[in-house]
Structure formats: structure tokens, C-alpha cells
A protein has these predicted regions:
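Membrane-embedded alpha-helical bundles of multi-pass transporters/translocases
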Residues: 1-297
């Protein structure tokens, strides 16, 4: 599931930049061309269906190995609600659930704004954006042993908080560096390697945190089973997934508010956008992300 999630997302980002949204020799196409997104959506939907079927059919044989709860003759709706509420009273679950809400909002906002920063702020073309997924795939492979090593060296909570703090501080570093005239201009050949290196480290740390966070959720399942004498992993992981999906949409909404507040013009070419608009975009987005991620702690 996690493999399809990360490699599928990275692979689709590569296909988007190199196939569906690539720029033609005549100057047509590219990130800002609407026509390519329709084909991209169809291809993504088909691959998502294949991924779900492979995951479901590939794990179906393990159903017999799962914990089988005791048979109960009659289950009333009120009893189900009572058991769900009892599970959600677990303090560790409540902490991780709230962290999912704030971090999911920040992640949704960051994902929605990333294409605007890449296109308008950094002036990257589709051919350059296609390089990033390659580095992200390598980062995903590096993150697994790093997360394992951190989990063994420290307890999961300390390792997760440490990686999360690093992510908060490191994420907006390039944006603030540009405002401080430390990062090279867009026409510099040094800029793309710097952005690739920054993105590699950032994605690696994000995946490390995701792995540690998932391991902490598994510990909550065991803790809840001790308190309630019931296995409630379905409720716990469903609640976490629901929180992430629900508030990622809220993050996209906040991204739209930020774009409106910064007065980013519609249908404008990157070279036609005023510098102050881009500065405002950074000053609205970066502190907002920092606040949301900090609240997740």
C-alpha cells in the first residue's frame, strides 16, 4: 500500500511533466496548458484502479491470518457507537489524530501551491520538473533504512518529533533564502541542482516521518486493545485516513485564499508576474505552513 502510494505518486508526477504536460518544439503545451491535464487525469485514474486491484488481490490471501473477534449474536447501533467512542478516548490516539488534522492541512496547502512556486517563483519548465520525481524515488528508497535506524536508536516518538522539527525548519529554507538574496537567480545554472538537493532531503525526511508516524499508530492499536479488550485497528486507521483526506481539501482551500490574497493574476505567463506578488506569495504561504506544522506537534 505504501509502496504504491509513494512510487505511484512519484511516477505520475514524472509522467505528467515528461509526457502529458511536456512542452513541444513549437512552444505549445507545458505546465500552464489545460489540455494535457485531461489525459493526465484519465491515465492517473486507470493506474489508480490497477494499484487498488493489485493491493486488494495481493493481500486477500492473508485475510485468514487476521485476528478473528468473538462472535456476538446481536449488535445494536448504540453499542457500536459506544465502542467507537471508547476507542477514540485513548489519549495517544487523540494526540495523533489532532496531529494528522494540522499536518494534513499544511500538506494539502503545500501540495496545491507547489506548482505555482515551481512555475512562477522558480521559473522551472516541464522538462526540469520531470527530473524531480527521479530524485524523489531515490529519496523514498533511502528513507526506509533511515527510519529503521532512527527507530532503533531513539524511541519512535522522539525520532518522529525530531524529523518533524527538521522538516518544519528545512522546508521553507530555499524560499526565505531567495528573499534574502542568498539563493541564485532563476537564470543561474546552480539553481536547479540546489532545488533538486533541497527537494531530495525534504522528501526523504517527510517519508521518514510518515513511517515513524505509522509505527506509532500501530502502537496505539495495541494500547487500545489493552484498555478496551478489543482490537480496533480498523477504527483507528480509518479515522487517521479520514482526517488526512478531509483536511487536505481544507489545505487546498487555504491555498486558493493565499493565491487570492497575493493577487496572482490569472492566465499570466511567469515572466509577466510582478516580483512583489511573488514575495507576497512566500510571505503568506511559508509562515502559514510553519504555523500549521507547529500546531501538529
Amino acid at each position: 500500500r505504501y509502496m504504491f502510494g509513494w512510487l505511484g505518486g512519484i511516477g505520475m508526477a514524472f509522467l505528467a511533466s515528461s509526457v502529458f504536460l511536456r512542452e513541444t518544439e513549437g512552444g505549445e503545451g507545458g505546465i500552464l496548458a489545460a489540455t494535457g491535464y485531461g489525459y493526465y487525469g484519465i491515465a492517473a485514474a486507470c493506474l489508480m484502479f490497477v494499484g487498488m486491484m493489485v493491493s486488494s488481490l495481493g493481500t486477500h490471501r492473508h485475510i485468514g491470518q487476521l485476528h478473528v473477534p468473538p462472535v456476538r449474536d446481536k449488535i445494536k447501533i448504540g453499542q457500536v457507537v459506544s465502542e467507537v467512542l471508547e476507542t477514540m478516548k485513548n489519549r495517544s490516539f487523540q494526540s495523533l489524530f489532532l496531529a494528522s488534522i494540522f499536518s494534513g492541512t499544511a500538506a494539502g496547502m503545500q501540495a496545491a501551491l507547489s506548482i505555482y512556486f515551481a512555475t512562477f517563483f522558480w521559473g522551472l519548465k516541464a522538462s526540469e520538473l520531470a527530473i524531480f520525481p527521479i530524485f524523489q524515488a531515490v529519496a523514498a528508497c533511502c528513507a526506509v533504512p533511515i527510519a529503521h535506524a532512527l527507530g532503533k536508536r531513539f524511541d519512535k516518538k522522539r525520532a518522529a518529533i525530531g524529523s518533524f522539527l527538521f522538516m518544519i525548519c528545512f522546508g521553507p529554507l530555499m524560499l526565505f533564502g531567495r528573499l534574502a538574496d542568498i539563493v541564485p537567480e532563476n537564470d543561474s545554472p546552480v539553481l536547479l541542482p540546489l532545488l533538486l538537493g533541497h527537494n531530495f532531503v525534504e522528501v526523504c525526511v517527510i517519508i521518514v516521518f510518515s513511517i515513524l508516524f505509522g509505527a506509532m499508530m500501530a502502537d496505539v492499536v495495541e494500547d487500545s486493545a489493552v484498555d478496551t479488550t478489543r482490537r480496533s485497528e480498523g477504527v483507528i486507521f480509518a479515522a487517521r485516513g479520514f482526517a488526512g483526506k478531509m483536511v487536505s481539501g481544507l489545505g487546498i482551500l487555504l491555498a486558493g485564499v493565499i493565491l487570492s490574497a497575493a493577487n496572482l493574476p490569472r492566465n499570466a505567463a511567469p515572466e509577466d508576474v510582478d516580483v512583489q506578488v511573488l514575495v507576497d506569495l512566500v510571505l503568506y504561504a511559508a509562515p502559514g505552513q510553519i504555523v500549521l506544522y507547529t500546531l501538529a506537534l
